[in-house]
Amino acid sequence: MFEDTNMKAVSAEVMGTFFLVFIGLTAFSTLGGGFGGAFAFGATLMVLMHVMGPISGCHLNPAVSIGNFMSNKMSQDDTIAYVLGQVAGAFIAFAAMAGTFS
């Protein structure tokens, strides 16, 4: 299992999801839920799309990866690896944020 999975792409998904969740939650925690938080979240997503897009497609969301699998654009192994990477990135971001603001 996972012999053909592109680990560079999975690593990009882990890092991309980490940055999206960490910066997004930090922005909303410090700037509030108004324009500043939304702008920081959107700007982070835009930068990640340009940086991670060529490497992994910049899914950053298990629903996107599962949708690509359902439309036969990804293999089952790649989908599982992407989803696990995205979940890991989100948990690492939460732990980093909890450590930062505790």
Language-model regions, residue ranges each:
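Membrane-interface helix-loop junctions and terminal tails of multi-pass membrane proteins
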Residues: 1-102
